[in-house]
Structure formats: C-alpha cells, structure tokens
Amino acid sequence: PNRTIQILLYGPPGTGKTMFAEALANELNMTMHRCKASEIIGSYLGESTRNMRAYMDGIINDESPRILAFIDEFDAVAGMRTGHNSGADGEMNRVVNELLQCIDAMVQSNKDKCIVFVATTNRPWSIDPAILRGKRLDTQIYVGLPDLEARRFLVQKGLGGSVPPKSPDVDLEQLAKRLQGYSSADISTICEKIADQPLFRHFRTGMPSCVTQRDIERVLAANPTSVSPELEGRYLAYNRKKGF
C-alpha cells in the first residue's frame, strides 16, 4: 500500500540499530536515502536548515516505489527546542522546525509510493516531543542488549569451530553467560581480541599456540562493558513508558 511508516529505533550504542535499517532496505528491495545527523549540521547560519531541506527533498522527489529514509544519530537534529531564538539554540530550533515541516511534506507526498522513515538514537529522551506525536515518529522500538541466545551466537561466530584453536579449559558457554551487559559490538570486539592472542604469542615465541582461559580473563579484564547498569536501567525505564 501507498503509505508512510515512521519508526524510531533507540537503545545503547553498538546494538545493531543501523544494521537493522540496512537489512530492512535490502530485504524489501527499497531505495535507501541514508545520512548521519552530523552530515546535516553545518558551520554557518542557516546551513543546517538548508541541508535538512535538501536531504528530505531528495526523498520526496524520488519516484522509486519503495523508499527507506534513514537518519542516524537522530537526536543531533531533533533535540528539544528551547525558548531562545538566537545563537546555537536558535539555529537548532529552526532545524527542528524544518524537520517537522519536511516530515509532514513527506507524508503528503506518498500517493504513489511507500516510504519507511527510520531514525536511530542513543538518547531518545532528548528528542523534541512534537516529533514523536501524531503521524510522525510515533512508533518507538527499543533495541536492547543481546540476551543469552544472542550472546551465544556472537561468541560462536567469533570463536567457535576449529579456528582459532582452543585449549580444553576454554568454555564458550560460560563466556557467553559472563558477557551479560555487553553490547553486540562489545562482544564482537572481545571475541576478535581473544582470537588474536595465540597469534601475538606466535609472533613473540615462534611456537604455535591456542586460545586459553587465561587469554579470556586477560581480555575481559581490559575491556569492561561500554553500557553501565545505570544507563541500561534508564533505557528500560523509557521503554516501559514510551516504547515496545
């Protein structure tokens, strides 16, 4: 059907929000208009507003039947407006006003096409409420930290199989359990660092080696989670109130 669907994906950094948008575009064979909010923010007065209009006009004028519009780091261009109309605050107020007008124009332009507008943020509580109401981004989806099943998958992907070789004391199931509270990106990085340890030893000694439990302990000690329990709690509280 010819319609506009608008979704806000929120959650901790490194949980795959951007990958979700890319997968959606590929799966549905959609033309993707992708940008980061930092690409919209300009250095000169009025530049950010013009960049926002140019990006949204590209979506509105695209004649493709299925379009996915994607803005990463959305809170940088959609923050709560203030009562100040001068300086940096005034400029950001104008950017948000322009964004609201563009979203409404995008909804009205979809008579012969389907538009899915996806925005991602690590700070959903900082977004101007007007953007999250009515026919705008009123569908909010929490993309949280991986559960045990997802952590098992990530650990097996990074360390399973015969490469890298592992000593008998290595327990990947236990590692997956210990990685509770880590983001998907954190886990992938940790697995890469663990897998590199035998290679580093080989460079030093010239002898073949394998992943040991000591390697795992060393890497975990040097790489704490990037998401604190307090921050995760804030996301969960927001999700109970606003999302699903």
Language model regions located:
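Hydrophobic face of alpha-helices
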Residues: V96, S188-C191
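Amphipathic alpha-helical interface segments
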Residues: K193-Q197
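Walker A/P-loop NTP-binding motif of AAA+ ATPase domains
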Residues: P1-R178, Y182
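C-terminal engagement/docking regions of AAA+ P-loop ATPases
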Residues: P1-N2, M19-F20, Q174-T189, L199-F244
